[in-house]
Amino acid sequence: MLAAGHPQREAFLAGLHIERLVLNDAGAVLSGAALDRIGLYVGETPTFNTLDEARAMVRSRLVTFGAHTQDQWDFLTDAVLRSTEDGRWRLHYDPAIAAPFKAALLALNGPTPDADLWPLYDAIACPTLLLRGAESDLLPRSVAEDMTQRGPKATLVEFAGVGHAPTLLNEDQMGPILSFLAEA
């Protein structure tokens, strides 16, 4: 959706053909309060003495992802952790990813407003599957329902017991995606 709003959109999209689109708990309006929540920790670079300590912190941030087995939690957390030369643990991502986000928050000088992406969503022209965690704070239910009536008129699938965002590790989450993509 962001490409649709880029100044060089036509050049970017030339020759690009998307047959089917899956949106995972991201919609035409993103909750400003949820963006504020994410802004509290994006860009942080904590280090941890043990892998268990690092896993516990990451898991506490991902609690909205819903129920998972211990192996699934280890998979999710280990993917974002790396050991350091001194035997400690750190998050594995570029903290500079937060710079534009934090600059935008500072420029607002107050609560973050909802991000209105309706013009971008309405420009989507392919069949679209919209996945939503039933307790998502980023994608309000009313927006998800509106997305089934506008633009590509997405097919909405919600997952109980999940917030932002479904991890797509469980069969009940993968099944709808596989079925949707098989329709192509």
Walk through the language-model features, giving the residues of each.
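Conserved alpha/beta-hydrolase catalytic His-Asp/Glu region
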Residues: N49-A104
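Flexible "cap/lid" loop of the alpha/beta hydrolase fold
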Residues: F12, L16-E53
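A generic "structured core" feature
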Residues: G163, P176-F180
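Active-site-adjacent alpha-helix of alpha/beta-hydrolase-fold enzymes
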Residues: E145-A154
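Catalytic histidine-centered segment of alpha/beta-hydrolase-like enzymes
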Residues: V162-E171
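Conserved serine/cysteine hydrolase catalytic core
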Residues: T84-D146
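Active-site loop/turn elements of alpha/beta-hydrolase fold enzymes
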Residues: L23-A26, E135, F159-G161
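Hydrolases whose catalytic domains are alpha/beta-hydrolase-1, hotdog thioesterase
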Residues: M1-H6, E10
